[in-house]
Amino acid sequence: MQKLEELYSGKAKSIFKTDDADLFVMEFRDDTSAFDGVKKAKLSRKGEVNNKFNAFIMSKLAEAGVPVHFVRLLSERESLVKRLQMIPVECVVRNVAAGSLCRRLGVREGMVLTPPTYELFLKNDELHDPMINEHHARAFGWATDAQLEEMKALTFKVNDILKALFDAAGMTLVDYKLEFGLIDGKVTLGDEFSPDGCRIWDKATGEKMDKDRFRQDLGDVIEYYEEVGRRLGVQF
């Protein structure tokens, strides 16, 4: 397989074509940003850590029957993934109140949410990823009823799998976002799962172990990413 020209460059990853039209190379970079790109930095080893972390999680999900675009690791920073027709909707599950939920609804950080909440956001940087609902998605043609139902079902299946995984490793999976796409019409998990796109707290101390360390200037961002991975069994 040959890596060809760059197709897309996002905030922290780049996608490259290959000589197989159905496969892409996903490259994880050291770039880090927060607050819609207002705060930016390069964190040494971040690309390598997130690449291996994502490979571990995606493999666990695939073993549990979740359809994923991840195929295999290619290098320290690169993974081979299946080509998806992306659905421009982010699915967010919150097990514990934190971040924007607290600001929007005036609830205290750390409140356990039973049952977990489920929210949809339009993936659009210019509009700052506004919250939407199923009616918007259908009206504007972003997703069909069947796709929305499958995305929701898969998102909660992922929650069941990963909550248990993190809990057994002494951590709380506070919240996370997922993105989906289509392969021959089948809803499939895309993008990545890493501490960049979720909140993780130490169960014993409540210490934040995710991208909030960058957002809130808590320091040792990558060291905590690696600690999360080591507890789960990721080989760095």
From Swiss-Prot:
Pathways involved: Purine metabolism; IMP biosynthesis via de novo pathway; 5-amino-1-(5-phospho-D-ribosyl)imidazole-4-carboxamide from 5-amino-1-(5-phospho-D-ribosyl)imidazole-4-carboxylate: step 1/2
Reactions catalysed, as given in the entry: 5-amino-1-(5-phospho-D-ribosyl)imidazole-4-carboxylate + L-aspartate + ATP = (2S)-2-[5-amino-1-(5-phospho-beta-D-ribosyl)imidazole-4-carboxamido]succinate + ADP + phosphate + 2 H(+)
EC number(s) reported in the record: 6.3.2.6
Xref: InterPro entries: SAICAR_synt/ADE2_N, SAICAR_synt_PurC, SAICAR_synth, SAICAR_synthetase, SAICAR_synthetase_CS
Signal peptide: none
Origin: domain of life: Bacteria
Keyword presence, Phosphoprotein: no
Name this protein carries in UniProt: Phosphoribosylaminoimidazole-succinocarboxamide synthase
Gene name tied to this protein: purC
